Amino acid sequence: MAGEEMNEDYPVEIHESLTALESSLGAVDDMLKTMMAVSRNELLQKLDPLEQAKVDLVSAYTLNSMFWVYLATQGVNPKEHPVKQELERIRVYMNRVKEITDKKKAAKLDRGAASRFVKNALWEPKAKSTPKVANKGKSKH
């Protein structure tokens, strides 16, 4: 009976999409409650500047994305709204932070280890009298 009432409010075709949306909103709500449980200053004190930037960017992106969804649910085209430009601006900064993170993770040359590796990898002939005699014999002919 309750299922029949639901079908009167919206088309049956979108029931699965609405259920998924409701589930996603519940997950977002849980995450926001978790984030809000800790004071922002307390959270940022535990992080290095790069991690702080990541938290700020993810927060800004999340809020703007939620506003994008809100606009869409109100029948406003978010692609024509300034929120699209704001999301692009945040993406640019996220890419910059990613580049910095990747540079930090990039392999660094350990000169001592490289020197030892090259030294041990190069072939050195052993000092024996036989190869010298063979070489002398070849050079005379």
From Swiss-Prot:
Keywords from the named record: Apoptosis, Cytoplasm, DNA-binding, Isopeptide bond, Nucleus, Phosphoprotein, Repressor, RNA-binding, rRNA processing, Transcription, Transcription regulation, Ubl conjugation
Region annotated Required for transcriptional repression, chain positions: 1-100
Stimuli inducing this protein: Up-regulated during adipocyte and myogenic differentiation.
MF (Gene Ontology): DNA binding; nuclear receptor binding; RNA binding; transcription corepressor activity
Nucleotide-binding as UniProt keyword: no
Renumbered residue ranges of the record's region Interaction with NR1D1: 50-100
GO CC entries: cytoplasm; nucleolus; nucleoplasm; transcription repressor complex
A Pfam family of this chain: Sas10_Utp3
GO biological process: apoptotic process; maturation of 5.8S rRNA; negative regulation of DNA-templated transcription
Interaction with NCOR1 and NCOR2, as annotated region: 100-141
Expression across tissues: Kidney, heart, brain, spleen, lung, testis, liver and small intestine.
Cellular compartments annotated: Nucleus; Cytoplasm; Nucleus, Nucleolus
Record PTM: Phosphorylated by PRKDC.
Cross-link (Glycyl lysine isopeptide (Lys-Gly) (interchain with G-Cter in SUMO2)): K119, K126, K132
Family: Belongs to the C1D family.
Function: Plays a role in the recruitment of the RNA exosome complex to pre-rRNA to mediate the 3'-5' end processing of the 5.8S rRNA; this function may include MPHOSPH6. Can activate PRKDC not only in the presence of linear DNA but also in the presence of supercoiled DNA. Can induce apoptosis in a p53/TP53 dependent manner. May regulate the TRAX/TSN complex formation. Potentiates transcriptional repression by NR1D1 and THRB.
Subunit structure: Monomer and homodimer. Interacts with NR1D1, THRA, THRB, NCOR1 and NCOR2. Associates with the RNA exosome complex. Interacts with EXOSC10; the interaction probably mediates the association with the nuclear form of the RNA exosome. The homodimeric form interacts with TSNAX following gamma-radiation. Interacts with RAC3.
Descriptive protein name: Nuclear nucleic acid-binding protein C1D
Originating gene: C1d
